[in-house]
């Protein structure tokens, strides 16, 4: 039986003329949880919580800006003939996670250089929190009925009906047609990556490997899920941008892992350089 219940209202709360959307609440919750977990892990590894908070203060807005630039660049035809301010109308939708990651990585490189800390250590600390935030954030797409796949077959519908709760079936049924809940596929995949990264940390891998594993595993999932989506950005009208970027990230990350395993001695649990210097000084004083 086709699900025809009314979809979830995108507006969670209305206070006078002010509307607060579920999308914003979900994204904010994911971001706050990610920041909290990253700060706790930084503290455990000997970095100050203030350092991570300072990084987040720069990384979050820059990541959002890059996410928008990335989207506008590949959808420029939408904005070329329209009013110029539409380029900045982020509230109307149009951001891309790959753009956000690029912005975050650039911020981390510059931040690490200025604050004299290891870029790879920051990246390793942030990676599990980032993928968890992405897993949560996809539920914002669910409420908005966006970033979904194409229509499903009757056989797939019957299979989904046995396992998926009604609220997902209802929300993914748009104008009488049910679509692939690609938000759910990616959210579940991201949670599995999160668990995998937590397990990887326990084995004290080479510094940078947690982040690079995040980059590889997320890109693998994104490559296949992107093939189902109906709202993909395209390069030259024939190549799905996210799939091309995913392949590029996988190749580069594998090369980095191989290179760093041969040339780098620092491990995930090693104290940051500043702490090592302090420990050496304290040892000399004791002598």
From Swiss-Prot:
Listed EC numbers: 2.5.1.145
Pathway annotation: Protein modification; lipoprotein biosynthesis (diacylglyceryl transfer)
One Pfam match: LGT
Main location: membrane
One annotated Gene Ontology cellular component of this protein: plasma membrane
Gene this chain is encoded by: lgt
Record flagged with keyword Cell membrane: yes
Organism superkingdom: Bacteria
Species name: Oceanobacillus iheyensis (strain DSM 14371 / CIP 107618 / JCM 11309 / KCTC 3954 / HTE831)
Binding site for a 1,2-diacyl-sn-glycero-3-phospho-(1'-sn-glycerol): 138
Keywords, alphabetical: Cell membrane, Membrane, Transferase, Transmembrane, Transmembrane helix
Entry annotated with the keyword Nucleus: no
Transmembrane segments: 15-35, 55-75, 90-110, 117-137, 180-200, 238-258
Record-given protein name: Phosphatidylglycerol--prolipoprotein diacylglyceryl transferase
């Amino acid at each position: 039986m086709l699900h025809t219940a009314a979809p979830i209202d995108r507006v969670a709360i209305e206070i006078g003329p002010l509307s607060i959307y579920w999308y914003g609440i979900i994204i904010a919750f994911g971001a706050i949880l990610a920041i909290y977990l990253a700060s706790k892990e930084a503290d455990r590894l000997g970095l100050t919580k203030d350092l991570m908070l300072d990084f987040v203060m720069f990384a979050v807005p820059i990541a959002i800006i890059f996410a928008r630039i990335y989207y506008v660049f590949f959808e420029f035809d939408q904005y070329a003939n329209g009013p110029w301010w539409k380029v900045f109308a982020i509230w109307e939708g149009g951001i891309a996670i790959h753009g956000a990651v690029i912005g975050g990585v650039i911020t981390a490189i510059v931040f690490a250089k200025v604050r004299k800390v290891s870029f790879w250590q920051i990246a390793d600390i942030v990676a599990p929190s980032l993928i968890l935030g992405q897993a949560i954030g996809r539920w914002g797409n669910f409420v908005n009925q966006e970033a979904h796949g194409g229509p499903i077959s009757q056989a797939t519908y019957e299979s989904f009906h046995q396992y998926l709760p009604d609220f997902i079936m209802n929300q993914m049924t748009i104008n009488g047609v049910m679509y692939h809940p690609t938000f759910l596929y990616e959210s579940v995949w991201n949670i599995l990556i999160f668990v995998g990264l937590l397990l990887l940390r326990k084995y004290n891998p080479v510094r940078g490997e947690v982040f690079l594993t995040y980059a590889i595993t997320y890109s693998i999932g994104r490559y296949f899920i992107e093939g189902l989506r109906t709202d993909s950005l395209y390069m030259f009208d024939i190549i799905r941008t996210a799939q091309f970027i995913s392949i590029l990230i996988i190749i580069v990350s594998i090369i980095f892992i191989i290179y760093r395993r041969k040339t780098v001695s620092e491990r995930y649990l090693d104290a940051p350089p500043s702490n090592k210097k302090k420990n050496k000084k304290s040892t000399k004083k004791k002598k």
